[in-house]
C-alpha cells in the first residue's frame, strides 16, 4: 500500500481507491474473484445525456474482461456508442437481517463496483468465445455450435475493467 490510500489489486492489476469504511472493504482477491465469477447479474451504469441509466445484464468474466451478450440495437447500444465509459455493480450474496429494533435492521451482502470501457468485437471468433463463456457460466454442458446467422444477429460487448472496489457487510 502506498501512503496515498491506494492499493493495487494484484490479480486484476488495477489501481483502486480505498474505501472510507475499511471494516467493510473487500481486498481479498479470491473473494473479488468469487463475486465476479459466481454472480448471475451485472448492472451496467451508462449516461443518457445528463441522466444515469442502469441496465441489468447476464455476463461472464475472464482475465479482467466482462463479456455481455446484446442485440445490435436498443437503448443500451445507443448510449454505449455515444460514451463507452461505463460503471458496473455486481453482488453475490444479499440477505436482510431483521431486528426487534426498527433501526437495527441491516443487510448482509458482498458486492463489487467498478469502472471500465466497453468495446465491440464483431469478429465471429471473438463472438463465439464470449458466447461460450456466457453459456458455460449459466450451465450449458453440451457442445456449443452456433449458426452463422445467429452469430450475425448478436453482439458481444467486452467491458475492460479499469478500477474496482469491493464491499461487504455482515459476518462472512
Predicted segments, located by residue:
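Extreme N-terminal tail/first-helix region
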Residues: 2-37
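Charged, gly/pro-rich active-site loop segments
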Residues: 9-23, 93-172
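A generic structural signal for nonpolar/aromatic side chains embedded in well-ordered alpha-helices
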Residues: 35-36, 80, 134
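Short Pro/Gly-enriched beta-strand edge/turn motifs at strand-loop
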Residues: 38-41, 140-142
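Short beta-strand segments
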Residues: 39-72
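Well-ordered beta-strand positions
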Residues: 45, 58-60, 81, 150, ...
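A short mixed-secondary-structure module that forms the rim of ligand-binding clefts
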Residues: 60-95
